[in-house]
A protein has these predicted regions:
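Conserved small-residue
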Residues: 1-143
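Generic preference for hydrophobic/aromatic residues in regular secondary structure cores
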Residues: 3, 12-15, 26-30, 48-53, ...
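Extended, Lys/Arg-enriched charged tracts that mediate electrostatic binding to polyanionic substrates
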Residues: 141-169, 178-194
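Domain-exit/linker segments immediately C-terminal to small folded modules
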Residues: 169-241
Length: 241
């Protein structure tokens, strides 16, 4: 649940009223820790307090690029472009990346890497970085799209929740989703802060989040422990291959 906190140091206050707000709080805490030298916040047993103006699209995208770095093809491409020479296999991989998904095709068009145009590719990445992050993040099936309607990323509060299982397309018939076939009984509160839910889940093929919300500090600790356990398991699985 989101509360206004007027005339206080922080103007926004979140409580873990259900799993959605619990997960959003975990994601937001990671966001604020990433910007710990720029932004302030307070976490108590009951509330996460912060200033709403500190949540911006530019900051969100920069955080997402860092947090899910290995999921962004432009980051892999960027690392290749920082090399001084390239093997045949590396050149092949670079050209695969240039057409890796819809937004990569849009940004790089018909460009093919020939060993002499690394600076051109670097410049295109830098100029189009926000679009590359946003479109990849919202449309990739194991990122935002795994949790919410990709068309709702960065949208203001809607008439129904952006999360799958709660989202109702207003242009389609929705009676089957409502108790006793009455659409007016379908309750689905939305909040732009639900965009932080993907950062609360951990896993590889399956993702997990523990709603241990006896207190917010306990919630954070439990999910930090889960994160470490999943990382260890993934590392062990990679070693055994």
């Amino acid at each position: 649940m989101r509360l206004s906190n007027d005339n206080e140091k922080f103007d926004t206050c979140l409580a873990a009223s259900d799993w959605r707000y619990s997960a959003a709080i975990v994601g937001l805490c990671k966001y604020f820790k990433y910007y710990k030298h720029e932004l302030g916040y307070e976490l108590s047993d009951d509330y996460l307090k912060f200033n709403a103006a500190d949540i911006t699209e530019d900051r969100y995208l920069k955080f997402a690029e860092s947090y899910f770095e290995d999921q962004f093809q432009h980051r892999e491409l960027e690392k290749y472009m920082n090399l001084e020479s390239w093997s045949e296999d590396q050149t092949k991989r670079i050209n695969e990346l240039l057409r890796g998904n819809s937004v990569m095709k849009k940004v790089f068009g018909k460009i093919r890497f020939d060993g002499n145009n690394s600076e051109e590719i670097r410049e295109l990445i830098q100029i189009n970085r926000s679009e590359l992050i946003r479109e990849t993040f919202r449309n990739k099936s194991n990122l935002y799209k795994n949790f919410a309607n990709p068309g709702q990323l960065f949208k203001e509060r809607g008439i129904c929740c952006r999360l799958w299982g709660y989202y109702v397309d207003g242009g389609r018939k929705t009676k089957a989703l409502s108790y006793n076939f009455d659409v007016n009984t379908f309750v689905s509160q939305d909040d732009p802060l639900f965009d932080f839910i993907p950062f609360a889940f951990w896993g590889d093929r399956e993702v997990f989040f523990v709603n241990d919300n006896f207190s917010l500090e306990q919630l954070i600790r439990t999910n930090e422990t889960l994160e470490k356990q999943v990382q260890m398991q993934v590392t062990e699985e990679q070693k055994s291959k």
